[in-house]
Structures are given as C-alpha cells and as structure tokens.
C-alpha cells in the first residue's frame, strides 16, 4: 500500500513539475495511469483496442483500426463459397481468364454505329490494359473512327493500370494524376509512350458508380481536352491508404495521401461539412441515368431474389435450339425477339413467391424488366455484347455521347 501511494505521489509530482510535455508523453502517461493506478482492474487489450479505434475514427471516415478477426477477413473473391444462400451453398460467378483466373475487365466491346466503337470497362484489373488494347484493335478492324468508353459502373482498381490505359489515348509525357500527402513523397504518374488511339473522337461515360482509379482516368482525359465526359458527377473516392499490421494480427488502415487531377483538383469528396472544395469529376454534358425502375419496390424484391435471371436462363436453356433456328444472327435477335411472354412467367413466379406489386410498381418498371429479360436471353445465346447492346437502349449517357460524336 505504501509503495502504491508513493507511486501515485511520484507520478503526480512528475506531471505537475514538467514545464513542457509533448502530446505523445501525455498519451503514454495517461495509458500508464489507467492501466496501473485505476481503482478497478482494466482489460488492457479491450481498453487499448477501443481507444485506438476511436482515434482512427476521429481522423476521417476511412481510417480505421482492424481487430485481429477483422484484419483476417479479406474481400470476398470470385469462386468463394457463400454458405446457405436460400438453403444452398452458392458460388460467386464471373467470367475469368482461363490462364490467370482473374476476372475479365472489359464487359463488352462492339460497334455502336458504323464508325463508333463502344467499350464497357468494369474495373482496372490486372488484365484490363491488355483487354482494352485488344478491343481497340478489333474495333479498328470493323471501321472504328471514334470511341466511347463506359465507366458508369467502374468501381476503380489498380491505379497503374489506369495510367497504362490512359497512355493509349494521351500523348507521351503528360500527367495522368498526382499522389500527394504531408508525410509521403509526392508522386507524379505520367504517360510514357505513343498510344493506340491518340487521335479520333473520344467520349467517356461516368456516374455515381465511377470511383477511384476510374475517376482518375476520366479526369486525365478531361483535363487534357482529350475526351468529352458525359453523364453525372463521379463518386469522389480519391484517398490513398496504407495498412500497418501489428504482431497480434490487428492492423491500422490509415490515410496517407490524396489523388489530384492534372489540373490540381482533389478527387476525394469532402467528408467535413464546412469544406467547400471541388471534388470528383464533373461531366462536360450532364445526363441523368434512367433510374425510374429502381423506385419500384417490387422490382427491387425480384432483383434481389434473382427471379429475372432464373426465369430468363431457364427459358433460354429450354428453347435454345428453336431460338437459334428462328434468330440466326445476333442482329436478327435484337431486332425481332419479344420477351413479353417471359415477363408473364416472371409475374407468375412472383405470385408464387408471394411478392406483392401495385399498378404503380408496374408503371415504373415493366418496360425495363421486359428489356432486361431480352438482354439475359441474348447473353445466353450470343454473349455479353448482345446483353449490353440490348440494355444500352436505356443508357441515356450513351445515347447523348453518340449524338455528340456526330456533331461537327
């Protein structure tokens, strides 16, 4: 007891007697006092974890402390099993490269009209640059003079691949973006060679689903006046984070830098209300997406449960032979196939599952679901290009970009 009292007196005297104390010293002394002097026992691990977590949260919405169990949990990968989805073990499906097992990044590449190519890029993955180059080569063979790149649902990916693909459209030695932070060296990412499509009209489609590396790519083409940007403002995700592991399996994920466009705009959307800085990528031509179907509760329910995909796949499998005989080409299918009868099967399945719907629901989403079913059957018969050719009938940004491409 006497020793404890002496320790308390010594610590109090030391703290009071220090003319200056650094924040780090204050933090260490506070931790020492709580662990060693508090009246009740303290679980050191829980106490430290709790306060580290709160410290990280106070920095920004993205810096965080990862407890050991959280740090071990990686992102779900294609091919991972999902236990007990509707009573059965499911496996994530995605078209992958047979050699690398990496997901394909180009969803579709086709001629949108006689001279305009269209490429839908879902992510900036390991194979994305090679896929884009191959798509450009094939489209050029088909007479492509201008190109539209669709990034509306591109969530980003590897920034070095964004630079590599931008290099196909920009002249040599141009800044694509800059990474800058107070405690890390500034790094400027530049083009380094002659690209495949440095001339010819270029449009990039963006929206709220355009994030991170996709925003950097679009901003570079915009800032260098290389592409016309069409759609809605991008998401605004432009932070660089590092993960610092601890020996116990926990880790800190901390923001260390920000990405800036060639004209110096920070991509990151402000997360402090009073900040009024510019952010993201603003389109040159603002075009709102077609989202009316999403306001239908019934549509959201059947989409979540996968009713359209199930019905369309079953129909395509059961009628594949007769469909291929009737529609001998992809073009013939797109022009003449009517999916209204399949829509009636969706309604019947919905009723069987007890999903309620109103006339208002139908008014909001019927036309979209009918088109979606046609696209899904088309994908089964002719592949992804057919799916996108059908669904892009409702792609407002694409329609505007095509109109802009033809303007003198």
Please report, for each region that a protein language model flagged, where it lies by residue.
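Helix N-cap / beta->alpha transition motif
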Residues: 7, 67-70, 339
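Composition-driven detection of intrinsically disordered, low-complexity segments
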Residues: 7-8, 98, 191
């Amino acid at each position: 007891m006497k020793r404890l009292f002496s320790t308390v007196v010594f610590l109090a005297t030391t703290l009071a007697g220090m003319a200056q104390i650094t924040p780090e010293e204050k933090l260490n002394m506070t931790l020492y006092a709580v662990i060693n002097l508090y009246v009740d026992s303290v679980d050191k691990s829980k106490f430290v974890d709790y306060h580290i977590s709160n410290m990280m949260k106070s920095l920004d919405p993205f810096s965080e402390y990862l407890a050991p169990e959280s740090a071990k949990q990686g992102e779900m990968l294609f091919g991972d099993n999902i236990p007990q989805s509707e009573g059965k073990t499911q496996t994530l499906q995605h078209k992958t490269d047979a050699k690398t097992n990496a997901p394909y990044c180009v969803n579709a590449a086709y001629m949108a009209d006689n001279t305009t190519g269209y490429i839908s890029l879902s992510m900036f993955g390991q194979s994305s640059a090679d896929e884009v180059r191959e798509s450009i080569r094939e489209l050029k063979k088909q007479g492509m003079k201008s190109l539209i790149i669709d990034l509306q649902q591109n969530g980003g990916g590897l920034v070095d691949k964004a630079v590599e693909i931008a290099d196909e459209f920009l002249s040599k030695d141009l800044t694509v973006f800059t990474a800058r932070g107070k405690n890390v060296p500034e790094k400027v990412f530049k083009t380094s060679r002659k690209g495949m499509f440095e001339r010819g009209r270029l449009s990039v489609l963006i929206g709220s689903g355009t994030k991170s590396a996709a925003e950097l790519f679009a901003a570079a083409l915009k800032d260098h006046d290389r592409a016309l940007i069409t759609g809605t403002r991008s998401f605004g995700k432009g932070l660089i984070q590092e993960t610092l592991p601890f020996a116990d399996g926990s880790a800190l994920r901390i923001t260390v830098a920000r990405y800036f466009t060639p004209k110096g705009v920070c991509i990151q959307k402000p997360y402090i209300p009073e900040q009024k800085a510019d952010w993201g990528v603003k389109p040159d031509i603002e075009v709102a997406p077609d989202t009316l179907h999403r306001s239908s509760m019934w549509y959201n329910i059947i989409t979540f449960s996968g009713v359209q995909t199930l019905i369309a796949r079953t129909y395509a499998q059961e009628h594949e032979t007769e469909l291929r005989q009737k529609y001998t080409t992809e073009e013939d299918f797109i022009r003449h196939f009517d999916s209204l009868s399949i829509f009636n099967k969706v309604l019947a399945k919905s009723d069987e599952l007890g999903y309620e719907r109103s006339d208002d629901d139908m008014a909001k989403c019927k036309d979209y679901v009918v088109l979606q079913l046609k696209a899904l059957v088309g994908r089964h018969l002719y592949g992804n290009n057919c799916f996108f050719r059908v669904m892009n009938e409702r792609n407002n940004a694409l329609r505007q970009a095509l109109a802009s491409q033809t303007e003198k």
